[in-house]
């Protein structure tokens, strides 16, 4: 129900074929090396399997597939990277709701349980969604020191860290999403 994106009909084989063709076009003609797929949890897994298999079949090309989602089935479908929403939620609870910091180790272990080899989880303290709908890391994590501590934790716990626009310089204002 987003107003800025089309809701595609994944029941349509013609739409699926065109979407995969478009993805292949970008890989071949624009020489991109991967895709970040928004709201990947909401797209049927069999579509992702077909699309990623097609992209991985391009000769002499290694694609990076990044799913904005946290279903581990996305990794089985061929994505190498998913969002660590569980960890991020617990991290905010540690800073704002007095959750024991040891819970971060528990959620981290759970996140990595059963993951296929050569797959990773993205760790962050801010991204475009959080900045648009929630607040800045400085506000969420109780100041600049808290935001830096939270970021260190995202590095320490493993995964792939995300540095969002302005975070590296302590940006304290929300960036316009649109």
Residue ranges, per PLM feature:
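Alpha-helical scaffold elements lining the catalytic groove of polysaccharide deacetylases
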Residues: 11-18
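Short loop/turn motifs at secondary-structure junctions
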Residues: 30-31, 159
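Aromatic- and acidic-residue-enriched carbohydrate-binding clefts of CAZyme catalytic domains
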Residues: 1-11, 24
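Active-site-proximal helices and loops of the catalytic beta/alpha 8
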Residues: 22-24, 28, 38-124, 138-144, ...
């Amino acid at each position: 129900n987003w107003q800025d994106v089309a809701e595609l009909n994944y029941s349509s084989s013609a739409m699926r074929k065109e979407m995969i063709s478009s993805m292949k076009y970008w890989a071949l003609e624009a020489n991109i090396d991967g895709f970040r797929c928004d709201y990947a949890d909401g797209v049927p897994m069999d579509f992702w399997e077909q699309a990623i298999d097609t992209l991985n079949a391009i000769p002499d090309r290694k694609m990076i597939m990044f799913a904005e989602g946290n279903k581990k089935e996305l990794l089985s479908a061929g994505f190498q990277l998913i969002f660590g929403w569980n960890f991020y939620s617990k991290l905010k609870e540690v800073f704002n709701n007095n959750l024991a910091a040891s819970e971060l180790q528990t959620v981290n272990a759970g996140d990595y349980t059963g993951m296929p080899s050569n797959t990773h989880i993205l760790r962050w303290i801010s991204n475009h969604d959080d900045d648009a709908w929630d607040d800045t890391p400085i506000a969420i994590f109780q100041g600049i020191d808290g935001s830096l501590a939270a970021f260190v934790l995202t590095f320490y716990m493993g995964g792939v860290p995300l540095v969002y626009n302005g975070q590296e310089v302590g940006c304290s204002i929300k960036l316009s999403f649109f």
